[in-house]
Structure formats: C-alpha cells, structure tokens
Amino acid sequence: PPRSTLFPYTTLFRSVLNSRLMDRPLRPLFPKGFFNDVQVVATVMCMDNDAPSEIAAMIGSSVALSVSDIPWEGPTGSVLVGRIDGEFVINPTSAEREKSDMHMVVSGTKEAIMMVEAGAEEVAESDMLDGIMFAHEEIKKIVAFIEEVVEEVGKAKKEIECYKVPEDIENDVREYAEEKMRAAVLTVEKQERLDNMDAVEVETQEHFAEKYPEGEKDIANILYTITKEQVRRLILDDCIRPDNRKHEEIRPIWVETGVLPRCHGTGLFKRGQTQALSVATLGPVGEGQRLDGISEETEKRYMHHYNFPAYSVGETKPMRSPGRREIGHGALAERAIVPVLPEVEEFPYAIRVVSDRKSTRLNSSHVSQS
C-alpha cells in the first residue's frame, strides 16, 4: 500500500508509545481507594536528539506528582540503558544508540523496579538482569534529587479515607469460602474454572443473604481478594498456576500456516481460548514506513500492526482507528522480531504483518509475535 496510508497514526506513533512508558510506573503508586481522575501532560518544548525526550517526560511526571498534594507513593526515577562493546551506558546519545545492542528503559523507586521495557539483539537473560541492576543505581540518585525538590517546594499530601469491610463479615466469608475458592481456582479447564468460581460466589452470597442483607458488595470484594491471594500463594509458594500447571509448563499450542492462499504469508495461532490470524505482505524497500516526528526522521522496513476488534471478546463498539493498546502491542511485536530479520542486502523487502485477534481470553499481545 502507499506509504501515506500504511498507518493512520504515523505522527502520533511515538507520542503514544511514550505516554504508555510514562503511565506504567506511575499508575501502580496511586493508593488503593483513590478514585479521582489524574491527568499528567508532558509537552516537549525543545528537542535534543542526544537526550531522549521520553526519559525527561517520565522524570518530569514523577516530579510533578511528588510536589503536588495528590496522594501518590513516589517518587520514581527513569533511565535509558544501552550496551556498547559489553559496557552499559546510561542515557546513550543518538550516535551511541546506533552502536548499542540493547535499548532498555527502566523505571523504579528507591526500593524496587516498577517497569522495564526493552529491545535487544539476542542478549542473554543474565546480561539483561545486570542492566536492570545497573539502571537501579542511577535511579536511586534521581529519586534522591526529587526528594530534595519535594522537601523544598512540595505540598502536604491530601488524606484519603478508604472504606473498610467490617471485620465480622470478612472473617465469616473467609471461614466459609476460602477453601472452596481455592478448589475452584485449581480447576484445569479455563471456562469450567470461571464457572466454578462464579458458583462459589453465588453460593456464598446465598449463604449470607439473611445474616448480611446489605452485604452483597462487601462479600463480592472479599471473594475477589481471596481469589487474588489464592492465585498468588499457589504461584509463589507451590509453583502451581491456577489451572494446576507448573510454572515452566505452557498450554497446548496449535498453529496453521497458509490459511489464505492469495496472501504472501499467513499464520493462524491458537493457545487456549486466544486465537490470532497474522498476514504478512512483502513490498519494495521504498514502501517502508517513514516516521517523521520531533526527533530524527527514521524509516521502518518491518511494520507490525495489531488489531483488537470488539467481537474477539464478545463485545460491540464503533470501529475506529487503532488506539493506545493496538499501537503499543504492535510495537512490542516489532521489537521482538526486528533483531532477527535478515539484513536488507540479503532480503531487500519491506515487510508488513497485520495481526487480528479472532478470539481473546486475557493477554493476547504475545500471540502477535508467534
């Protein structure tokens, strides 16, 4: 297809990915029970290609939330990690990024890592872990700086009062339903497991309907908490997933190729209740996608576009242009596949893959890469 119509959000592509980078380390640090809308806007006023704007935006967002009166359990720091000739580099310049075999954004607090997003050229897992630890040392310095700023100009945080389920209801529900929910969570087949979990909730609600006539929401919240605790305990303590699989086991995978005879390449991938149809199309190298934004203009020879139609989860909604989720998941697949593509001299084609979800149960982004 013509270059201009390859992707409807060409100019916003990088902004969408950067906003997702900003969001992921910030969102988990808002306290449970805080339901106010919070909007963080990062605007690039001036651009230096040697200083990644996304890192400045992530740190700036952390500073803004930290000095405000908004309840938030930051601050966080963020860095870009590269690796050149086996040596890690913090926030590499544009020229250094060209030589780096790793591009990893790490964000965290003083105590823990909050987010990692990376692309690498077949780098060993141990090296990636070393890179994360290297980044965390720099993050601690950034957090210390932000804490100094907060001490000087920060506002007192607003106090929020969260509703707490009455202790007697929680104790009764746990005593009655905890083991039942554990047994339901261990059901092997997914739909049957969900049905069993729903049955436990219905049974529990009926059991306590007379004793706690206005406690339906409280009981539902307690059961949700019990489910999370059981899943977490099974995984961390017993190394068992909710469907009785060990942590190294995967569900059966089914793949069929050549599904559409007129296309250059097609693959239908199925795992559990998730299915995806991916279609690959080849074109001249000149039909690659040009990314023209505030940073250096670049071209992509490989384009991976991810579609998540409402029907794949049994819903209806207007069919619009790709949203943040689709753009982000397409970029995730690109990051995994580009490093293993043959060089352009060996394979002089532009490649476009479109992955459509046909049926989805929980996470489906990884299916695009398969």
Where are these regions (language model features)?
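Conserved phosphate/anionic-ligand binding catalytic regions in large, soluble enzymes, centered on
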Residues: A51-D69, V255-A280, S359-R361, S368
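Single conserved hydrophobic/aromatic residue that forms the stacking wall/gate
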Residues: P1-T11, K358, L362-S370
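Flexible, glycine/charged-enriched surface loops at secondary-structure junctions
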Residues: K32-V38, E73-P75, I142-I160, Q191-E192, ...
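Mobile "lid/hinge" segments at catalytic clefts and subdomain interfaces of large enzymes
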Residues: D69-V188
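Alpha/propeptide regions of enzymes that mature by internal proteolysis
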Residues: T10-P31, F35-V41, A51-I59, A64-V67, ...
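Extended, hydrophobic alpha-helical segments in both membrane/secreted and soluble proteins
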Residues: S61, G328-I337, Y349, V353-R361, ...
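Glycine-rich, flexible beta-strand/loop modules in the N-terminal catalytic cores of phosphate-handling
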Residues: P8-Q39, V44, A51, K110, ...
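Extended amphipathic alpha-helical scaffolds
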Residues: K158-T298
